[in-house]
Amino acid sequence: MIRIGILALQGDVSEHLEMTRRTVEEMGIDAEVVRVRTAEEASTVDAIIISGGESTVIGRLMEETGIKDVIIREKKPVMGTCAGMVLLADETDYEQPLLGLIDMKVKRNAFGRQRDSFEDEIDILGRKFHGIFIRAPAVLEVGEGVEVLSELDDMIIAVKDGCNLALAFHPELGEDTGLHEYFIKEVLNCVE
């Protein structure tokens, strides 16, 4: 059995919980999906999903709770969406706490402010996916070994590095479980 933790410090936690639970059920795998609020809870999961929200607040709370240290020390696979993408970076256009798990530079709010939010069909992993972009970041540059999975309007919106996945958009707000399934399959390969 694997345990997937949804970081529950701030952001759209319930949407990720529901989507991840639905995904493991559809996949027919033995998995538990739980909220992670403390370093102790972070130590009990095989992977963590960091949702959208306010990246500065989430980063600060991850430091205060010790969750950041657990993720880094125990090399937990992480999927970060929107604010989670920002937190996975090792550099951003704003001074804030970061995990630094992916060699990339991210620009916060690259697609504009809240009123500029939009939805678009994107190509990712050889298929179409409905992307929901809310004050979305974008990757400005990636280091060696970082795989670019998708671009939109010449901006990088999805990358993978090892067992870590960063998405500029919100797959948890749609109906398609494809990207959650992709991440869970990666986790299964990483924890074997």
From Swiss-Prot:
Keywords: Glutamine amidotransferase, Hydrolase, Lyase, Pyridoxal phosphate
Active site: C82 (nucleophile), H170 (charge relay system), E172 (charge relay system)
A molecular function GO annotation: glutaminase activity
UniProt cross-references to Pfam families, sorted A to Z: SNO
Entry's EC annotation: 4.3.3.6, 3.5.1.2
Highest taxon listed in the record's lineage: Archaea
Database matches in InterPro entries: Class_I_gatase-like (IPR029062), PdxT/SNO (IPR002161)
Pathway the protein contributes to: Cofactor biosynthesis; pyridoxal 5'-phosphate biosynthesis
CDD domains per UniProt: GATase1_PB (cd01749)
Reactions performed catalytically: aldehydo-D-ribose 5-phosphate + D-glyceraldehyde 3-phosphate + L-glutamine = pyridoxal 5'-phosphate + L-glutamate + phosphate + 3 H2O + H(+); L-glutamine + H2O = L-glutamate + NH4(+)
Binding residue positions for L-glutamine: G53, E54, S55, R108, I134, R135
GO annotations of cellular component type: cytosol; glutaminase complex
GO biological process, one term: glutamine catabolic process
Family indicated by similarity: Belongs to the glutaminase PdxT/SNO family.
Subunit structure: In the presence of PdxS, forms a dodecamer of heterodimers. Only shows activity in the heterodimer.
Role description: Catalyzes the hydrolysis of glutamine to glutamate and ammonia as part of the biosynthesis of pyridoxal 5'-phosphate. The resulting ammonia molecule is channeled to the active site of PdxS.
Entry-linked NCBIfam families: PLP_synth_Pdx2
Protein name: Pyridoxal 5'-phosphate synthase subunit PdxT
